[in-house]
Amino acid sequence: MTDPIADYLTRLRNAIKAKHRVVEVPASNLKKEITKILFDKGYILNFKFVEDGPQGTIKIALKYDLVNKVNAIKKLERVSTPGLRKYTGYKEMPRVLNGLGIAVLSTSKGVMTDKEARDLKIGGEVLCYVY
């Protein structure tokens, strides 16, 4: 697999379109950090790391509106790819949907949202947009 983050986002996207309640994805440290951000920002209901085998998996409970059956995540968009890395400074940091969405960045201080990176005045690699 050449791009594990794109695979992670695609598995989430497919589970949302199929209206699944839980999705399992292969685990890595970067995927765990992205999942924690999605949980903290309220895009997913819950997650659990399951150690089975050398890699382990992450079980993610997706969040749906009970009345309208609409998911909390409208779009997951991969920005930086292995073939074309996208880096940004804190001054040029993208605002996703004018601040309604989040950009997930990999910085020297770890994986964080665009707002956290802007507050710390550090740039990094833009991994994905979530809204």
From Swiss-Prot:
Alphabetized UniProt keyword annotations: Ribonucleoprotein, Ribosomal protein, RNA-binding, rRNA-binding
Protein name as catalogued: Small ribosomal subunit protein uS8
Gene3D superfamilies hit by this protein: 3.30.1370.30, 3.30.1490.10
Coiled coil: none
Keyword rRNA-binding among record annotations: yes
Function: One of the primary rRNA binding proteins, it binds directly to 16S rRNA central domain where it helps coordinate assembly of the platform of the 30S subunit.
Origin superkingdom: Bacteria
A single MF term (Gene Ontology): structural constituent of ribosome
InterPro entries listed in its UniProt record: Ribosomal_uS8, Ribosomal_uS8_CS, Ribosomal_uS8_sf
Assembly and interaction partners: Part of the 30S ribosomal subunit. Contacts proteins S5 and S12.
GO BP annotation list: translation
Family: Belongs to the universal ribosomal protein uS8 family.
